[in-house]
From Swiss-Prot:
Keywords: Disulfide bond, Glycoprotein, Repeat, Secreted. It holds the Pfam family Trefoil. Residues 402-522 are annotated as: 12 X approximate tandem repeats, Thr-rich. Extensively O-glycosylated. It comes from Xenopus laevis. Residues 147-170 have a biased composition (Basic and acidic residues). Disulfide bonds join 162-188, 172-187, 182-199, 307-333, 317-332, 327-344, 354-380, 364-379, 374-391, 526-552, 536-551, 546-563, 573-599, 583-598, 593-610, 621-647, 631-646, 641-658. This is Integumentary mucin C.1.
Amino acid sequence: APTTAAAVAATGKDTTAAAEGSAAAEKTAAAGEVSAPPTAAVAATGEDATTAAATAAAETTAAAGEAPTTTTAPATTAAGKAPTTAAATAPTTAAAGAPTTATGKAPATAAAPVPTTAASKAPTTAAAATHSTAAAAAPTTAASAAKSKERSTSSSSEEEHCHVKPSKREMCGSKGITKKQCKKKNCCFDPKGHGGIHCFHRKPKGHSHEEHTTTTTKAPTTIQIATTTTTPTTTTTTTKATPTTTTTTKATPTTTTTTKATTTTTTPTTTTTTTKATTTPTTTTTTTPTTTTTKATTTTTTTSGECKMEPSKREDCGYSGITESQCRTKGCCFDSSIPQTKWCFYTLSQVADCKVEPSQRVDCGFRGITADQCRQKNCCFDSSISGTKWCFYSTSQVAATKTTTTPTTTTTPTTTTTTKATTTTPTTTTTTPTTTTTTTTTTKATTTTPTTTTPTTTTTKATTTTPTTTTTTPTTTTTKATTTTPTTTTTTPTTTTTKATTTTPTTTTTTTTTTKATTTTTSGECKMEPSKRADCGYPGITESQCRSKGCCFDSSIPQTKWCFYSLPQVADCKVAPSSRVDCGFGGITADQCRQRNCCFDSSISGTKWCFYSTSQGNAMCSGPPTKRRDCGYPGISSSVCINRGCCWDNSVMNVPWCFYRT
């Protein structure tokens, strides 16, 4: 112990530290631990604290039986010295000192550990702290610098790619798209500018590719800086540098998204469209026109030529925000490769099927129906001709309706025989006795016996009333004849078997009932409490008149409204009082208003009671953009325009946005 204290004092160390080291050494010796005495000699030589720490670490490794090379590498890197000193000193001393001390006596063990504990305790802590701080600071600073540089590069490149003039922007997405939705499409978003395109495509893809290449070359530099250190902190830094590569990979799906849009353009051409033309006749021949399920499930592949047409000649088949799958289930074409055009449109055969003369159109909807509502019914829509039906059935649909009419229930064959001839034909009549035959004949001579008729000139005017399914028909015949011989008239019931050879012109009249196609409502649309029914008709309205208006009819519950609006129609009449457009005149009654197919609500005073529904209001604003009549002034807002009772639509450029209703 005195020797250890003297050595500590000689090296210029603190006396307190030496005392603490001695006490710790004595405890170590008492516990029977093994220490490496040469450490005191190394510390006494006045070497740098870092070298002492490296030597202590090497001795500890040697005592544990590890290879000295592992400790040499980090010590050399942190201290900046040659590995020869640490390697030579640490293993040799530890190998010689450790066994001798373990097998020696107690005094030798107590004398040696004191400087070892004092020398190794303080420098090791300092060296470890210095090494840890230096090792962690370098790679972390380099990684953060690389990240900030990458962020500035990506933000500047994004600004460069999104710097497009408003006049040259190509729309990316639908009207009203949010910034988040726009960014998901990898497009640019700029809400500045009145009436411009807010979500638009980037500049040509060549610039985008150069940007990705620059980012890829910068990422490996950051990883090389982190690899230089081998401490645990360095491992953490390497993990943080990895997301830089992930960012580069994340930019790659931009190209994939663009390719997907190109693929979609070709695929829809060969999918569904002849469904409407081919399937409809098959369905209607077998079943009634109510069976529309087969039409929806059957899918017929169309040729690519069905969808090849000029973008300006496309006829809209969908509605705002329709998806590709929804469009194809309707049997229409889908092509989203050309911006600012109709993406879901009819095929050539469907366009031809909707070419119906205005006078021959069969109504498919109701007054004021919108284009979207009409197309959801799979009907044709054409608002270019005023005063005609805008929503109507196609040619194939009308033909299918006529084919489905069964002649057994609607056709009543009635035969009226008018004889204008002089016949000299022997007639053999067999009369079967029946109890239901009633004959009333006004003639000069009435007989019911078989006779041979002589030449007679007879003019017969007969009125025959024949029920549809009655076998025996009572006949009332009034015969006015000028003859020289008595006239014999024989009345034969329908069940009589008659074999006669006569030359008599016969006129057959066939009555065919053609059922007019009416708008059908599903049972779910008419299910509501009787007290909540909104009157759709007027006193004395019939069921056919009610259904022709597209309303529900139920006469099973007395003292309730029998003709009432369906649930969608009730919702369609939910118009805010400030947005109502007058459909009538001052003092109009509810019946007069409903005869105009308008909504009536007298519950709120000081507002319009008879007004157009939401769909009717939209239909009045859905005319061709080129025929709009300006209702506002430059810079008018949408709220001011609507308060004027006018239409507002800013989706089409170079036309009035605030315009009068049609």
